[in-house]
From Swiss-Prot:
Listed SUPFAM superfamilies: L21p-like (SSF141091)
Top-level lineage group: Eukaryota
Keyword Mitochondrion: yes
Localization (cell): Mitochondrion
UniProt keywords, alphabetically: Mitochondrion, Ribonucleoprotein, Ribosomal protein, Transit peptide
Protein known as: Large ribosomal subunit protein bL21m
Quaternary structure (record): Component of the mitochondrial ribosome large subunit (39S) which comprises a 16S rRNA and about 50 distinct proteins.
Gene Ontology MF terms: RNA binding; structural constituent of ribosome
Main subcellular localisation: mitochondrion
Transit peptide start-stop: 1-43
Assigned protein family: Belongs to the bacterial ribosomal protein bL21 family.
Amino acid sequence: MAAAIAASALPGAFGRLVSVCSRSILASQGSGSASLWSASRRFNSQSASYPQGYVPKTSLSSPPWQEVVLPDPVEETRHHAEVVKRVNELIATGQYGRLFAVVHFASHQWKVTAEDLILIENELDIKCGERIRLEKVLLVGADNFTLLGKPLLRKELVRVEATVIEKTESWPKINMKFRKRKNFRKKKIIVNPQTILRINTIEIAPRLL
């Protein structure tokens, strides 16, 4: 009889224990969510105190090097006009010395001056003795000035002429392949066509535009 009473009382006690535990867990969760909510409100209030477009000071927002100050456009224009005037005076009086140029020809860039020889590892469809004009001029310069192209100088500003003086072949190059104990041996002789040009003149316009 006593055992039956104890067995009947056990489910009720267990149910009360479960309800008490669930209430304590819910209460703890409620306090935690409330604390998180209050913390988020404090963070939002602190972030709202910064001005709009605020960027924290870091190595990216504030680089360690000095800020580049661009020149005044009016002053730059005046200085450019003075330089052009001085270069025009040097060209008009012929007091610029020996001219040199950088030309682009046959997929290469060549720094040349008058009476220079350039060897081109290619065959050109030009006969010996013919005179050609090198139109792709990247820059031309003298002792006191240099004119740079962006990327090329205008054709009416500078003129570089050359003459084909020789068309020949390169010295034979032997390419030998050998594998030991494989009875493999391969020999190849490479001969490339060559063209030699002589730079005749480098002329510049009498006045810069």
